[in-house]
Amino acid sequence: VTAGPPRDPAPQPTALGAQDRRLLDALVERIFPRGGVPETPGAVAMGAAAYIDAALAGPYARHLGEYQSLLAAVGGQFPSLPPAQQDAIIARLESGTLDQPEAERQRAFFDLLWRHLREGLFCDPAHGGNRDFVGWRTIGFPGAQFGYRAEEQALDARVERPPAARRDLPEAARLPTLPPPARQETRPRPADVVIIGGGFVGAVVAHRLVRSGREVVMLEAGPPRDGRERVMDELLATSVRNIGGDAKFNDEIPTWRRNAAETAMPVRPGQGLETALGGNSVAWGAAAMRFYEDDFRIRSATAARYGEAAIPAASSLDDWPLSYADLAPYYDAAEDLLGVSGLAGANPFEAPRAAPYAMPPLRTSGLGALFAEAAGREGYHPFPLPAAILTAPWRGRHACTYCSFCSRFGCHVDAKASAQNTVLAEAMEGGQLRLVTGARVLSIVTDDSGAAVGVRYRDAAGEHRQDGGTIVLAAYAFENARLLLLSRGRRHGRGLGNETGQVGRHYMTRQQPAVFAQFEGRRLNRFIGPTAQAMAIADLSADHFDHRGLGFIRGGRIAAFNQYLPIEASGILPPGMPRWGAAWRDFFRGSYNETAMLFIDPEILPYATNRLDLDPDHADRLGRPVIRITFDIGDNERRLIAFLQEAATRIATAMGATRLWRRPPLTGPISTHDVGGTRMGDDAERAVVDSLGGVHDTPGLFVLGGSTFVSLPAVNPTLTILALALRAADHIAGKAPMR
């Protein structure tokens, strides 16, 4: 990788005094020291310390006090100590064994410092770190590019490009298909339908309803968009950070405990959850698979093949109240809206389709071909992952350029489907959709009969009431459950939909127990292409194999994903690898372009004890309780994950991996596949909504989104969420179901 055009950052402010800055310089220089063959500059020469100092005067100002306190604990004599003594102090800081402050603060500070240091080493130089691109050059990352040719994705291909000039990268003012200015509702007046949530689900439902002649008001808690989410910059990364879409979430961070005996503590997701117009549709990874036929009759199919005793006694596993055949025409409609690329029949286990995909799949990368060949030798049936990413022009959108910035970014050519480039602009054209952004819904209003008739919301101008003939709750799983529980009335003392205590129960979230594989001496070029440009196997998904004697039911998908950006990648280390010093420096320098991830999507069974409720001890800035997550995986999931990791290890070994390591089975209580909490079902005693999203105990109220899921199959949920939303929208509009 050659040096690119200079990115001269603006003069950087500073927050630290001279002594603290000297301490910081010495500390980060020891964490990422100069050395190696060929020699790598240290953290100070690479601009990492200057980056941190400037960030503490700006976006990270809230951390300044913690830096000052912990730098004092490290001690002013640190810069003059011999390297061995400096190393001993760093080790004690990391382990929380310095004399002061308390251990947890020390460990948390080291984690924070390590994250900020990695940003300073590998961010775009426009932010003041990665001086002269030296961080990128050290690991072989070409920086921001508009796209790559197929031959550059071949195994061992040399990619020798300078980073694109900053002035030539996409900016909001020059980006295509931005939605028209939001028609902000300034004086609420009754509407036929009020939709809570302006994400993918809300936008798709609004589009369907306005086309049927309905007057719709959509309330979105987050800000509108101006295109900044499409900037190719890992530090700004998620459009969440770039547009302030995390502001609402930061005000109401959920708490988590594994079981009811523990004390719940605030927990942040490892991936951004975005509150902004269009929701996560702008930053999603765009994998777009349908569920399998037996996913909808999961309990009866399992019992028929293995007996009821095979189902874990603690699991609340149940069949869905609809079949694949009921949803198939809406899968067709959702794929048509998005523009899904794929190869019908390539996955031998897929459910029947009425037609081929709209366009061919994303091209196969060198890594994908290596995975497919090895998986085939192991007896599996690899296939290209269907994706809501165009491989040919489609309705004014452009084909994928295979840049490095897809998942967690907006698409600079609109190849990746989003609410903005599929339904929002068209829905707003006729004036029947009225939009309010920055509107935090406080509660759903019911009348004396118990029917939903409106919502109370708060915006910058104060508190308002918006009435409507039908209310559609289409927020994320957490907010769907939270609003139902907060909306209490004379006939709903426990909250809406909660007459039988079902709201919040059966919560499920995807675990991500990947297997990492290093191929020493090879160039994988995983920084090229979208995440969804993947080869996958479904042989071990659902009930596609005999489970007798295995000690678990159901399965999981294994896939070789692309998109590997350096700030994130620098934090992925094998067990026993230190997070600092020459060993970390040399490992990451050599392994960045040699490391693959075999991503595992295990099926997570529902348990009534895994639930969402209101935390009595934690509140948001308005004084309202936040969501408390009670979640753990069961023995079934632990055995399943171990089985899938063994299979992934065999595939990686067949691919020629020289080093392998695994994530733990429990990767957290929040992912981007968070479902359940307002389960659908025909029996009002055991479910919150019916198969169309209608709330059993609250006429006029519909709940849509992943929160209505009965189970969490080994498939990305978005396509099914949208198909269910389209089906519900037809019902609300008075149309007969499609067949």
Give residue spans per PLM region.
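Extreme N-terminal leader/targeting segments of oxidoreductases
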Residues: 134, 146, 153, 160-193, ...
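Conserved redox-cofactor binding core of oxidoreductases
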Residues: 242-243, 250, 260, 264, ...
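N-terminal Rossmann-like FAD-binding beta1-loop-alpha1 element of flavoenzymes
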Residues: 191-218
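Mature-region segments of soluble proteins
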Residues: 6-10, 18-26, 30-177
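Glycine-rich loop(s) and the adjacent beta-strand/alpha-helix scaffold that form part
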Residues: 211, 215-217, 221-236, 430, ...
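N-terminal FAD cofactor-binding segment of flavoenzymes
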Residues: 221-295, 323-333, 372-376
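FAD cofactor-binding and catalytic pocket of flavoenzymes
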Residues: 259-261, 265-273, 277-284, 288-304, ...
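A glycine-rich dinucleotide-binding beta-alpha-beta segment and adjacent secondary-structure elements
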Residues: 384-390, 399-406, 442-445, 593-604, ...
